[in-house]
């Protein structure tokens, strides 16, 4: 096991513990903000530890990951308390549209990049 693998394992363990403690002991607002922020920081760290620099792809991955986590937290909150959605329909509709756009852009960019790389290798 290399030093990078050990560091990644330690930071991942710390991230899982922090996220678990946030889920168990915090209210919904802290959960909705804290967990995506922790995921963002964790994904940025994983991108940085790979080659000691961050490129656009690493930041896209980190931002997409944190927004998708926020999306799932909102879905769970709505399933537990449907009144949240009925009181804030416009905000949730805008957020769901934003998430759809971000995911489409992320995967569209990746597939375009992969097809460009595969056509360049032939």
From Swiss-Prot:
Keywords: Cell membrane, Membrane, Transmembrane, Transmembrane helix. It comes from the Archaea. It is found in: Cell membrane. The keyword Membrane applies. One of its GO terms (cellular component) is plasma membrane. The chain crosses the membrane at residues 7-27, 29-49, 62-82, 89-109. The keyword Iron does not apply. InterPro entries: Cytb/b6-like_sf (IPR027387). It is a multi-pass membrane protein. This is Uncharacterized protein MJ0321. Its main location: membrane.
